[in-house]
């Protein structure tokens, strides 16, 4: 939320040697530099330089982008002009692009936009590489560290073995509680839900070199790790030799073949690792639905699914609605428009601005149709958590889904496996299914995000920044997706053996719930 004058004015003042000596005092960690002073690969984009003048130009561009293209400019506590001015005041004559990227990442991490900031440069392969995925640091753990939702498991992702089978959880590193290390990682993680911050913070644990920087601790090629058992009654301490490159594979567990081996024949299982839009994939999903008509129950596994397309939802949801039921409103949103839109040369399309999200304005939904009648009935109860300003945004758009003419899963128990790795289109998927007859969400709360991200390139540093362009709301409760997320009906975390394919207690519980169900309704509620 902008609370001060335009950054351009502030920068003009700086050019005359006038500045407020206290204006950057609250942003000490954000304006910090020196992350990339050690010897680096000369071809690494983070090793390049940007001058003070070039950086200030990019800061002015970013300030304008935040004002005119960021959907949550008035919804969060980010005072972009103030923080960008603080960065500008502290700029050296020239700096590493990596340091500048870290400053921008930390600044925009004050927002609620789960898709932001994702500051990225171009790597040797010509691909965009996010600084959040490759922050500074020269020391890494030689094994994977993954979150169950509240605890951290250490394992070898190649051999699929726990590092300490009797003590699978990491309790402390260098004598410091694991939660404090995850808190240190929050400097580059957006101010979203607690589960999003924990999930993304846990992903940074492997880069212990970076976290030591954030905690102002000395660098070392070793780390003292305290492992503990399940009930925390016994612990063992190990000195771990660190490595110079990350071994984290960022796999999305479980692998489909691992899970299918555990599924009985009378239960249908489908693993959605990503919300795909590929026609062949969607066709195979639709075929699976048809082939599963005679099963006793259904398990849809979206654990670690970080989003993608809404097509899997549009393929499945019609088969969960009774053929005689009304369509359901799933999502409501308004798009942040470019200056001057709508207007001459920038007229509003008849189908609206969000057709690629399968969302339509009310004018594009004919009166008398089932979709329009469902919308008219739903609208009086819609009280958005935050109302976007009238100026600068499109009309409201809505995602409405109706039943299939021959729904396959009505009357069957449907268990959806979820976790805090679910985000974006997966949040839409979960919110649309939550509360439907026969559907039970099992796992941990999703991260929370839906904002139709747009990528913008800063002209002098060539850094990319992604910003939310849509204020997106859950139809079921009028709340935003960003900063909220979706809660499960039954909370359950995975056990350590899940990460090495030794067991899957969540999947076993889903099978039990189906076995216990007589009609699929009200499981776990």
Model-predicted regions and their roles:
Residues 322-394, 402-405:
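A substrate-binding/cap region within the structured catalytic cores of diverse enzymes
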Residues 358-377, 471-491:
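Extended, charge-rich low-complexity interaction segments
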Residues 265-267, 294-298, 410-414, 437-440:
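Loop/turn elements at helix/coil->beta-strand transitions in domains of secreted/extracellular proteins
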């Amino acid at each position: 939320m902008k609370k001060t004058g335009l950054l351009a004015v502030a920068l003009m003042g700086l050019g005359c040697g006038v500045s407020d000596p206290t204006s950057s005092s609250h942003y000490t960690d954000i304006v910090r530099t020196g992350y990339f002073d050690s010897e680096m690969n000369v071809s690494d984009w983070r090793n390049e330089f940007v001058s003070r003048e070039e950086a200030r130009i990019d800061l002015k561009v970013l300030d304008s982008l935040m004002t005119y293209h960021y959907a949550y400019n008035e919804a969060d506590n980010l005072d972009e002009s103030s923080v960008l001015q603080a960065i500008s005041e502290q700029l050296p004559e020239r700096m590493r692009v990596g340091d500048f990227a870290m400053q921008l990442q930390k600044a925009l991490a004050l927002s609620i936009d789960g898709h932001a900031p994702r500051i990225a440069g171009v790597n040797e392969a010509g691909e965009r590489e996010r600084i959040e995925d490759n922050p500074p640091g020269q020391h890494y753990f030689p094994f994977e560290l993954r979150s169950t939702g509240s605890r951290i498991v250490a394992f070898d992702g190649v051999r699929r073995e726990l590092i300490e089978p009797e003590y699978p959880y990491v309790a402390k590193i260098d004598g410091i509680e694991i939660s404090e290390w995850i808190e240190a990682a929050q400097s580059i993680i957006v101010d979203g839900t607690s589960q999003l911050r924990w999930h993304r913070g846990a992903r940074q644990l492997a880069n212990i070199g970076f976290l030591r920087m954030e905690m102002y601790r000395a660098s070392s090629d070793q780390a003292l790790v305290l492992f503990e058992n399940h009930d925390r009654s016994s612990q063992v301490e190990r000195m771990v030799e660190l490595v110079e490159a990350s071994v984290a594979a960022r796999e999305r567990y479980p692998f489909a073949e691992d899970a299918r081996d555990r599924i009985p024949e009378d239960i249908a299982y489908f693993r959605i690792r990503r919300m795909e839009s590929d026609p062949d994939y969607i066709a195979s999903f639709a075929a699976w639905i048809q082939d599963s008509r005679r099963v006793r129950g259904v398990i849809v596994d979206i654990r670690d699914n970080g989003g993608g397309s809404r097509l899997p939802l549009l393929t499945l949801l019609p088969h969960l609605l009774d053929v005689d039921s009304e369509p359901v409103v799933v999502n409501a949103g308004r798009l942040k428009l470019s200056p001057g839109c709508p207007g001459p040369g920038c007229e509003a399309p008849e189908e609206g601005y969000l057709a690629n999200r399968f969302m339509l304005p009310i004018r594009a939904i004919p009166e008398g149709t089932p979709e329009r009648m469902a919308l008219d009935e739903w609208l009086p109860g819609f009280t958005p958590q935050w109302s976007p300003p009238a100026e600068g945004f499109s009309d409201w758009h809505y995602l409405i889904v109706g039943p299939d003419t021959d729904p396959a899963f009505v009357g069957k128990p449907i268990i959806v496996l979820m976790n805090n790795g679910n985000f974006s289109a997966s949040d839409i998927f979960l919110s649309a299914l939550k509360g439907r007859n026969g559907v039970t969400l099992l796992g941990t709360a999703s991260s929370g995000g839906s904002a139709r991200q747009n990528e913008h390139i800063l002209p002098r540093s060539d850094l990319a920044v992604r910003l939310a362009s849509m204020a997106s709301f859950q139809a079921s409760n009028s709340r935003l997706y960003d900063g909220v997320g979706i809660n499960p009906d039954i909370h359950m975390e995975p056990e350590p053996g899940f990460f090495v394919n030794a067991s899957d207690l969540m999947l076993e519980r889903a099978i039990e719930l189906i076995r216990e169900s007589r009609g699929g309704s009200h499981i776990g509620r």
